[in-house]
Every structure is written in structure tokens, then in C-alpha cells.
Amino acid sequence: MNARENPFATDRTQRILTFRPEWANTSMSELTAQWEKLNRRAEILGRHDSGKSTLLTSWEQWLAENNQPVIHIFLNREHRNISDSQWQQLTESQGKIILLDGEEQLSWRQRRKFYQLSTNAHGLLITRHKSGSLPTLCNLDPNIQILHHCIKEVSPENYQELAPHLPEWWKKYQGNIREILLECYDAMK
């Protein structure tokens, strides 16, 4: 099978695997109601590749559908700093929702500046690996059942072939679903 036909190609899995609240035993209406109770300032917790960014992307789509202006900032190990243009956007955050993916990447000084600038925002939702200064909206903890859902969603026709390997891969990659999807890609070559 060539790369273009592989059902587990990264661009395809990212397109297909959007956040499914029911897989986390919740609903979007429950999450939004909880966010409102937390005064629209909360954090999404979870280990690396647990679905935090996927949830944040779904949240951004939901906000866009409801005509809510958004400032979305993505940080990771390779990109740890907020850019000058993003800092400028944050100075104009009143009435906007700020989504910060990877808050723990910021230095103490940057974090302090970020929270000062986000005070007047209409809402704030961040992702972290461990609890920080905001109340927790949800803690994503993937399990092997979610992995099975993902495989069935991406490639139902290959599920029976891949299913026997999933427990082994789950252990090998310590529950990192993204890495297991790459393993599925290799298995389909």
C-alpha cells in the first residue's frame, strides 16, 4: 500500500479524529456549562498526546460557529515562546476568547505577563500536563477503549487485523495514541 492510500497517514487521521466528548464520558454541553461555572477561565489537563490539542481545536470550531472571536496560541517543546505579534494580540484581548495550547512551555516571566494580559479576555482555556493556577475543566486520560474507537473510526476495514496488536502497542507506547496510530501506519505498508 502506498502512503497516499494508507488510512493511517497523519494528515488523514488528524482530519478524521476530532474530539469526541462521549469517548471521555462527557458532552460538549456539559463541558461548556462547566466552563461557564468556572467563569470561562479553566485548564484542560492530560499527559502528552492525550487529546488536549484535539479538544482545544474542537472548542475553537465551536466558538467560531457561535461567532466568538478567538486568539489561539500553540506552544510545544520546539516553539516555547509567544511571538511578538501574539503578544500584541493579547494586549487587544478584551471581548475575545484566548486558547493557549501548552501553557507549561512558558517561562515564569512569560506566564506572569500572559495572565496579566488575559485578565480582560472574555474567556481563557489552556492546556497543561499538570494542574496549574486555573481550575480544571477536564482531565483527559486516554484508555485502550479510546484507542479501539480511534482505529474503528479511521479504518474500520482494517480493525480486525489490527485489534490483536493493540494491547501490545498500548504497553509499548505507554498509551500514546498518536504513536500507536503511526505503528498502524507502518503495519499497513
Q: Locations of the language-model features?
A:
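A short, basic N-terminal segment
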Residues: 1-39, 183-189
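Walker A/P-loop nucleotide-binding motif
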Residues: 38-58
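Active-site signature of alpha/beta-hydrolase-fold catalytic machinery across serine-
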Residues: 58, 62, 183
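Conserved catalytic segments around the Walker B and adjacent sensor/switch elements
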Residues: 63-79
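Conserved P-loop NTPase "ATPase switch" module shared by AAA+ and STAND
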Residues: 73-77, 87-111
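Sensor-1/coupling segment of RecA-like P-loop NTPase cores
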Residues: 104-143
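Conserved small helical "lid"/interfacial subdomain of P-loop NTPases
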Residues: 138-167
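Amphipathic alpha-helical "lid/sensor" segments that cap RecA-like P-loop NTPase cores
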Residues: 162-189
